[in-house]
């Protein structure tokens, strides 16, 4: 499976194959009424006979098309028609416009109705490109739906500080090079103990630090940290020093000594853990840089800064994050690559359990194309990864669980297809690995990706907030948000199942077919197909999953 991850995340998407489509029930595919209208009174008998024959032919053709449509896999029952998804053709409208977006706020800058109307509009329409940078901050949880303008400004300031602190840690590691901890052993014991105390405190307050931070803290100017953090460090160090001074006067000196020893042992243990984290971080740094330099340039047409970046600005940023061998990149691509490095390293520091894995750059790249401020892009990525992070676990438990669900859906939706996959030893559905891992980023165009993701985010947020009272909403509310994406993958797969059954006789051919879907998928049709799968199969799949987990 790890080999599949490497293969699927590095393979370029093809564009040579055209997708199969289901028969349409739209009246536009049928002859107009005028073409079959009766002849005028002054027509001769021959024209009357010819027109009558033509009319009968059209009626027959309409009947055939109607019957064919009813027998199509895409046909739905009357019960299904009553359960319209937010993306049905009838409901689809223009994307949320800037004017509509502004009208959703009260004079205090608060979304009306707790954001209910906002979520409904976004999940059924999508978002105009000019306001995506603002809207995504709400969709991805950077700003609370009930926040005021003043509260959001405070959050923005705090989030910027937290991101800058993560950046400083990354810069420390970059300057330290190989991350040796020899200097730590050379420190006087008292000084080393003090640094351990600072390390433990910082760990508790802001998250994991590397062992090199313990060493670098000695030489770090106090201006590099917030004054409140300095005060906390001074208080802790002062408290630790005074505990030694009071020993002769206190009866519980032995207890204090034991407590101090325990503290140092705990701190040393934390340092050892962070040494291992630092070794991982060095590996992540190398992979991040390689992936950043190889990032595709499709985003450039959507980025607001793509044509405004000078060569000197791009090179300065690239050097600040340690990029090398970038002479082949134009300025806008180099700037984008440097931003990828900075934010992905900060995330690896923020979430060391996940760190970095190939494919994460695919998820971040669209966010960077939309949001120009690094600290805002970082926290949007954090919000995105809250749902996607289990896809990148080293044990692959998350991805295996999702592939298992894909397999169950196929088995219950199309037994003929499943039997064919069994014959090819592909029933584990690893051929949709890439779709699940990077959320259709490789199969959809860049604009389609942006549209799909923002609608998906709004849909998930709306369901969690209880928006909508259709049976579809109630069913989806019980499923983990990331499972929805699997349904999209299955919808795309089901649409092409006849090609797979009839043409392919090997796993490699199926993988190639999945990879060739780039640019051939209709986002709104994909969402509609996913809706029908959820309505018809969710309860059954949930029951099967629960019975197997017991």
From Swiss-Prot:
Protein name: Rab GTPase-activating protein 22
Record key words, sorted: GTPase activation, Nucleus, Peroxisome, Plant defense
Cellular location(s): Nucleus; Peroxisome
Function description: Involved in defense response against fungal and bacterial pathogens. Acts as a negative regulator of jasmonate (JA) responses during infection by the soil-born fungal pathogen Verticillium longisporum. Involved in abscisic acid-dependent stomata closure in response to infection by V.longisporum and Pseudomonas syringae. May be a downstream component of brassinosteroid-mediated signaling.
Gene3D superfamilies: putative rabgap domain of human tbc1 domain family member 14 like domains, Ypt/Rab-GAP domain of gyp1p, domain 3
Mutant phenotype after disruption: No visible phenotype under normal growth conditions, but mutant plants exhibit increased susceptibility to the soil-born fungal pathogen Verticillium longisporum.
Cellular component, GO annotation: nucleus; peroxisome
Any one GO MF annotation of this record: GTPase activator activity
Tissue specificity as recorded in UniProt: Expressed in root meristems, vascular tissues, guard cells, trichomes, styles and receptacles.
Chain intervals with Low complexity compositional bias: 7-49
Main location: nucleus
Cross-referenced SMART domains: TBC
The protein's assembly and partners: Interacts with AGT1 in peroxisome under biotic stress conditions.
Induction of synthesis: Induced by infection with the soil-born fungal pathogen Verticillium longisporum.
Domain (Rab-GAP TBC): residue spans on this chain: 126-460
Stored InterPro entries: Rab-GAP-TBC_dom, Rab-GAP_TBC_sf
GO terms, biological process: defense response
Domain of life: Eukaryota
Region spans: Disordered: 1-49
């Amino acid at each position: 499976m790890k080999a599949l991850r490497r293969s699927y995340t590095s393979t370029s998407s093809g564009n040579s194959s055209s997708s199969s489509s289901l028969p349409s029930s739209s009246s536009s595919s049928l002859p107009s009424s005028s073409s079959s209208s009766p002849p005028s009174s002054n027509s001769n008998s021959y024209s009357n006979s010819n027109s009558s024959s033509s009319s009968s032919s059209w009626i027959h053709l309409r009947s055939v098309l109607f019957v064919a449509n009813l027998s199509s896999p895409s046909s739905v029952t009357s019960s299904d028609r009553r359960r319209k998804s937010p993306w049905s053709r009838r409901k689809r409208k223009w994307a949320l416009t800037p004017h509509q977006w502004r009208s959703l706020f009260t004079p205090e800058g608060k979304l009306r109705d707790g954001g209910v109307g906002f979520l409904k509009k976004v999940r059924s329409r999508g978002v105009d490109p000019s306001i995506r940078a603002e809207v995504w901050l709400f969709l991805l949880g950077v700003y609370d739906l009930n926040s005021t303008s003043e509260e959001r400004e405070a959050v923005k300031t705090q989030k910027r500080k937290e991101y800058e602190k993560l950046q400083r840690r990354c810069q420390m590691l970059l300057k330290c090079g190989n991350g040796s901890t020899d200097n730590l052993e050379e420190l006087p014991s008292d000084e080393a103990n003090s640094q351990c105390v600072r390390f433990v405190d910082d760990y508790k307050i802001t998250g994991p630090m590397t062992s090199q931070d313990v060493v670098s803290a000695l030489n770090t100017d106090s201006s590099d940290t917030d004054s409140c953090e300095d005060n906390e460090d001074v208080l802790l160090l002062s408290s630790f020093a005074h505990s030694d001074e009071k020993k002769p006067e206190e009866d519980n000196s032995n207890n204090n000594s034991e407590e101090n020893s325990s503290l140092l042992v705990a701190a040393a243990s934390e340092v050892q853990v962070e040494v291992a984290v630092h070794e991982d971080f060095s590996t992540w740094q190398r992979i991040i840089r390689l992936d950043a330099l190889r990032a595709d340039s499709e985003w450039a047409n959507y980025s607001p800064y793509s044509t405004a970046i000078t060569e000197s600005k791009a090179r300065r940023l690239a050097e600040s994050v340690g990029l090398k061998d970038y002479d082949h990149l134009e300025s806008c691509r180099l700037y984008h690559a440097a931003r990828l490095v900075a934010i992905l390293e900060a995330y690896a520091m923020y979430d060391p359990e996940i760190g970095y894995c190939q494919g994460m750059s695919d998820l971040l790249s669209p966010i960077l194309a939309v949001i120009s401020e690094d600290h805002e892009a970082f926290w949007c990525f954090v919000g995105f990864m809250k749902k996607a992070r289990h896809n990148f676990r080293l044990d692959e438990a998350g991805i295996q669980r999702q592939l298992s669900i894909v397999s169950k859906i196929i088995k219950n939706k199309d037994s003929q297809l499943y039997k064919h996959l069994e014959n090819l030893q592909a029933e584990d559905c690893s051929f949709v690995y890439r779709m699940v891992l990077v959320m259709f980023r490789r199969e959809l165009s860049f604009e389609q990706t942006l549209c799909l993701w923002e609608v998906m985010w709004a849909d998930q947020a709306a369901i969690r907030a209880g928006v909508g009272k259709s049976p579809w909403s109630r069913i989806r509310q019980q499923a983990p948000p990331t499972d929805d994406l699997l349904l999209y993958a299955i919808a795309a797969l089901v649409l092409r199942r006849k090609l797979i059954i009839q043409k392919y006789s090997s796993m490699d051919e199926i993988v190639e077919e999945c990879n060739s879907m780039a640019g051939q998928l209709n986002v709104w049709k994909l969402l509609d197909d996913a809706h029908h799968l959820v309505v018809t199969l969710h309860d059954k799949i949930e029951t099967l999953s629960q019975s197997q987990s017991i």
